Amino acid sequence: VDPRNFKNYRKGMLDVALAGVITNLIVAFVCSFVLALLGDWIFSYSASAAVYYLKYFLFYLLGYSVLLNINFALFNILPLFPLDGFRVIEAFSKRDNGFLRFMRRYSGTILLALILLGFVSDSFFGIDLSPVTLYITHVGGWITSALKWLWGLLGLNLPL
């Protein structure tokens, strides 16, 4: 994205930053709806091998599309440069901000340290203690539960 093309820099950067996250959530929403519509059919008995593999393929395609798009949205909204979350904070902050300078310079190191913390804690303690993993797992679980609840109101079963 070339910010020089924006008439209003802050609004343009905010729109671009939120577009990716919102698109991920919309794709997850639509795929979860299709999966919920097909849920009972996917788990019904199939005498034909072709139908069985079609159901298998659709279940994994739609299920992973839901989960991956939720995870992508949650990862992209982290306030680390150059992710979308940083751009959102940048749009609402003053231009010469110490936090923004710090994050531009050290975000890569911070993200690497957070991910390595997960690998080290998993290797030594058998538990992934990475804040990024915990955040995505918990908040992603809440979003998935909300989708299950929503489709349950319509009498649909979201098999995730």
For each feature predicted by the language model, list its residue ranges.
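Hydrophobic transmembrane alpha-helices and their immediate loop junctions
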Residues: 1-160
